């Protein structure tokens, strides 16, 4: 959507003009590489990811497939990113949970770096949680230059979100 493209344009403009730090949120910037000090429980290999009900390179496509890497399932029709936190039959918590889907409401900030689409929201996958409460997410979306990216959320940022526990 136009608003999503504008949001990404604003993010990348700020990113490029500030040397890679938007300076707005305290979390880390968006990066295609695993941030320093973090590890993944399983490597990401998108070559086997399917796109039957979620469009390729959308946040929903990536999160659904990444969860399957861990044997975790979400419904084939969970809706847009903001809809995941509203789906019946799933436990939803505001406590960051490893290997859960983190659902961002429409317009909600994503780690102080950019805002989720005002209509569709966003969804990402929780890769790790540090003892200081910071959270590593992996995510995809058509506005990113790579198939997936990583981003670190501070404890304060992470506490404002909804974590959907898969089955």
Spell out what each predicted region is.
Residues 4-10:
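Short, exposed coil/turn segments at beta-strand boundaries within extracellular/luminal domains
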Residues 9, 136, 146-148:
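Surface-exposed loop/edge segments in extracytoplasmic proteins
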Residues 11-17:
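C-terminal edge beta-strand
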Residues 17-21, 128:
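Extracellular interdomain linker/stem segments of modular secreted and single-pass surface proteins
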Residues 25-131, 135-140:
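Secreted/periplasmic proteins that engage bacterial cell-wall peptidoglycan
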Residues 142-144:
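Short coil/turn motifs at secondary-structure junctions
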Residues 146-167:
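Intrinsically disordered, low-complexity, charged/polar segments
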């Amino acid at each position: 959507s136009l608003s999503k493209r504008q949001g990404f344009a604003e993010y990348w403009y700020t990113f490029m003009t500030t040397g890679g730090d938007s300076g707005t949120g305290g979390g880390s910037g968006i990066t295609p590489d695993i941030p320093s000090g973090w590890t993944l429980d399983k490597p990401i290999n998108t070559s086997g990811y399917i796109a039957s009900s979620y469009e390729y390179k959308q946040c929903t496509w990536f999160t659904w497939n990444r969860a399957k890497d861990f044997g975790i399932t979400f419904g084939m029709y969970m809706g847009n990113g903001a809809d995941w936190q509203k789906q019946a039959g799933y436990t939803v918590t505001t406590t960051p949970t490893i290997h859960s889907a983190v659902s961002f409401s429409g317009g909600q900030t994503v780690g102080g770096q950019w805002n989720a689409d005002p209509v569709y929201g966003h969804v990402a996958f929780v890769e790790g949680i540090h003892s200081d409460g910071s959270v590593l997410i992996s995510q995809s979306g058509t506005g990113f230059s790579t198939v997936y990216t990583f981003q670190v959320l501070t404890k304060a940022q992470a506490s404002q979100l909804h974590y959907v526990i898969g089955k």
